[in-house]
């Protein structure tokens, strides 16, 4: 097999959470262009339908399932549906996440649990269901989107880094427990990306200046710049990559 063929996702089926827009959508776009049948998830059926239509118009194979990621039973039903309709689930991208920027003293116990449910335990539950399905075919790729803020912490952002470090631990546990079964587990740790959610920040002159100061590439990342990293980890070009965190931050995390 030639090297370019190893990046093909033909006949692969993937779930990408939080993929109606932003980084998740760009990953979905790359996967469909590489030949995968991608299931997009999120809360808004309207947003997901528009995203799926965009992918289909470009010749991609895509469907969607609208549900709250904290509804773990709904995630399990999606895995079962994919197994019934396709016979195999090959790739899971744990991308969905929320943000609540506050110092710890301002969090109630329930506030903490709400963020942890969305950013951590939902991925644990869906990964559990996914590896059970993948194990039936002896093949799988699990990619978990973490953040450089899992190990470089900003003031007043107490719980988000906790969840992101937890996701790294999940990724490594899956890598150790399931690698011998043909299922690899890796993570992507993004830096500053100019997604729709961050659009106002990315255009703020102070944040533009901050990026020039802190990021060696002197700019924010564009959403499509994460797609190549995800495609690599999902493909047969990464068959011996397992338990790895691939940082995609323009060098921000290595600059003093």
Where are these regions (language model features)?
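Conserved glycine-rich cofactor-binding loop
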Residues: 13, 20-22
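Substrate-binding pocket helix/loop in short-chain dehydrogenase/reductase
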Residues: 103-104, 111-116, 211
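Active-site loop immediately N-terminal to the catalytic Tyr-X3-Lys motif
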Residues: 105, 152-158, 180-181, 218, ...
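Short, small/polar-rich loop/turn modules that mediate ligand/substrate recognition or access, typified
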Residues: 179, 184, 241-243
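Active-site helix of classical SDR
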Residues: 127, 163, 171
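Short C-terminal tail/terminal secondary-structure segment
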Residues: 2-5, 152, 231, 242-256
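Residue(s) in the substrate-gating loop at a strand-loop-helix junction
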Residues: 147
């Amino acid at each position: 097999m030639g090297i370019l063929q190893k990046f093909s996702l033909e006949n692969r089926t993937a779930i990408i959470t939080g993929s109606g827009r932003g980084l998740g959508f760009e990953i979905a776009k790359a996967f469909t262009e590489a030949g995968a049948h991608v299931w997009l998830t999120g809360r808004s059926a309207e947003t997901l339908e528009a995203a799926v239509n965009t992918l289909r118009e470009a010749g991609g194979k895509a469907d969607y399932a609208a549900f709250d990621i904290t509804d773990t039973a709904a995630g399990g039903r999606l895995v079962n549906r994919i197994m019934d309709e396709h016979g195999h689930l090959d790739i899971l991208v744990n991308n969905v996440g929320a943000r609540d920027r506050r110092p710890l003293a301002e969090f109630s116990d329930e506030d903490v649990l709400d963020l942890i449910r969305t950013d951590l335990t939902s991925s644990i539950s869906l990964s559990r269901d996914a590896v059970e399905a993948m194990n039936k075919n002896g093949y799988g790729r699990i990619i978990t989107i973490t953040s450089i803020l899992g190990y470089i912490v900003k003031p007043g952002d107490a719980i988000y880094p906790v969840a992101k470090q937890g996701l790294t631990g999940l990724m490594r546990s899956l890598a150790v427990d399931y690698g011998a079964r043909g299922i690899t587990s890796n993570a992507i740790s993004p830096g500053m990306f100019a997604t729709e959610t961050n659009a106002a920040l990315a255009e703020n002159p102070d944040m533009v200046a901050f990026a020039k100061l802190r990021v060696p590439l002197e700019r924010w990342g564009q959403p499509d710049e994460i797609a190549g990293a995800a495609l690599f980890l999902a493909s047969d070009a990464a068959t011996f990559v397992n338990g790895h965190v691939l940082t995609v931050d323009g060098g921000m995390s290595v600059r003093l």
